[in-house]
Amino acid sequence: MEGLAGYVYKAASEGKVLTLAALLLNRSESDIRYLLGYVSQQGGQRSTPLIIAARNGHAKVVRLLLEHYRVQTQQTGTVRFDGYVIDGATALWCAAGAGHFEVVKLLVSHGANVNHTTVTNSTPLRAACFDGRLDIVKYLVENNANISIANKYDNTCLMIAAYKGHTDVVRYLLEQRADPNAKAHCGATALHFAAEAGHIDIVKELIKWRAAIVVNGHGMTPLKVAAESCKADVVELLLSHADCDRRSRIEALELLGASFANDRENYDIMKTYHYLYLAMLERFQDGDNILEKEVLPPIHAYGNRTECRNPQELEAIRQDRDALHMEGLIVRERILGADNIDVSHPIIYRGAVYADNMEFEQCIKLWLHALHLRQKGNRNTHKDLLRFAQVFSQMIHLNEAVKAPDIECVLRCSVLEIEQSMNRVKNISDADVHSAMDNYECNLYTFLYLVCISTKTQCSEEDQCRINKQIYNLIHLDPRTREGFTLLHLAVNSNTPVDDFHTNDVCSFPNALVTKLLLDCGAEVNAVDNEGNSALHIIVQYNRPISDFLTLHSIIISLVEAGAHTDMTNKQNKTPLDKSTTGVSEILLKTQMKMSLKCLAARAVRANDINYQDQIPRTLEEFVGFH
């Protein structure tokens, strides 16, 4: 019956109404109920024949299912729309989101709930507003769709239509008394969303309906949001309409100019100078009431520059692009505040431009500053840390010197991030745990890349001690992957993933130097993964024993010298020798096997199934268990 359900689903998906009818012909009522309620899974999506037919706009199939087979309209599934995964979507939600008006009308006329919500509290009306289908929006509202239902982030239909730029939908919702001043969870209103996206007609419409100028949760007004997003026409419109004081006006112009200096999509150094100069003139227009800047203390990452405080200082750097770039970063940090989520993006962009031009020292200064800002704001920094591994690898590959203090600094930040991500994984909801675990494991791999890079860097004894301290700090936390791998397991494993953007030019696993360094910093040599395998169990399965003999040999020697038990058994009762997949690793292992009397006794206890629990000291129980 499951195979037949697959054919039924395929026919519904492809709009083959005659094929579908033939497949269901002469079936019992219970069989039909099973076939039309069967949830098919495909590419991360879960849907029934009705849901997929509605999603794909097959009105004839939908009509057949509703009128002839009385399929329930409230069936729910999981679908993908514009890169988003929508859980708990009905056929009506799918039809509205995909713009299939005929299907929408069919479903509503057969009793579909127009206010049914998905898991994230999204309604069919919201889906239609996202897509900008005014005809569907009107039809749903005329059939009692509630325009005030917000999603789980308190984001309303008006907000999504404003952000997506659907002016006609925005106008209609406002005419239907949608609240222009409703606030999302982040404190933003529809005006914030329209201003950020640069939809000037929608901004005008919202102003006409008396949308209030308020600050969001990050202390940003729509004017500031538009300036930060380089939406000059919106800024100029709001400045002409909004009742803002002189200081707010100046800061908006400064922020707009500063943002043009370091925005990948909107970079325009001429506009940077233009708006910064306009703002400066506003500061000095009243000689009796000059608005002096409250400049930030010099910041190392910005070349210890001090922000221009008068028109003459600004004119002096007019032709100096690099100075204007730094001026832009300084101005943004002053106006937005160091804890603002958007401050770091242009810093990272400017650093990347330096890296592309082989100006690595300046790149690293900026990226370290951005990393500290993001960690101070408790932001997820796994991408930032990986970026350092990539640029350090690129430098080594190009024979550029990497400074040990820079590596130590990033390692320290990496330890902090891994500790925080371990806590996130423990305390996060089941729905988000997979993503959190991915980020956490990515951080572990990045840490290993950084350790590997440190082994290829000239270090003083003091620098090496500082690096080793960070490695020790992380080992002490005992971070584990899903498989229970420790850092040592990962260091000896050929399956440990290596990032392919510059990093794989320098880093590879198994890695003898990384293994030795981890052991020197206190890694537990006999720690086991979820399958009971020690690092020695892993390395003897390395499948390049000839071409990479030195690595295999060095790692086995390091592990054994650090106290690895060569007779330790995993959950399959296999020793490293049993797990050895090549003659070379077998020979290497045998030459290192020095069985102690203690090990022989433990193996005898296990081999003869002698009860030892609670019969010997607790410290020995674990030891016997290993054997």
Curated annotation (Swiss-Prot):
Gene3D superfamilies: Ankyrin repeat-containing domain. Activity of the CRL2(FEM1B) complex toward FNIP1 is inhibited by BEX family proteins (BEX1, BEX2, BEX3 and/or BEX4) in absence of reductive stress. Mechanistically, BEX proteins act as pseudosubstrate inhibitors that associate with FEM1B via zinc in absence of reductive stress, thereby preventing association between FEM1B and FNIP1. Zn(2+) 1 binds at residue 185. Zn(2+) 2 binds at residues 186, 218. Pathway: Protein modification; protein ubiquitination. Component of a CRL2 E3 ubiquitin-protein ligase complex, also named ECS (Elongin BC-CUL2/5-SOCS-box protein) complex, composed of CUL2, Elongin BC (ELOB and ELOC), RBX1 and substrate-specific adapter FEM1B. Homooligomer. Interacts with PPM1F and PHTF1. Interacts with the death domain of FAS/TNFRSF6 and TNFRSF1A. Interacts with CHEK1. Interacts with NKX3-1. This is Protein fem-1 homolog B. It comes from Rattus norvegicus. The gene is Fem1b.
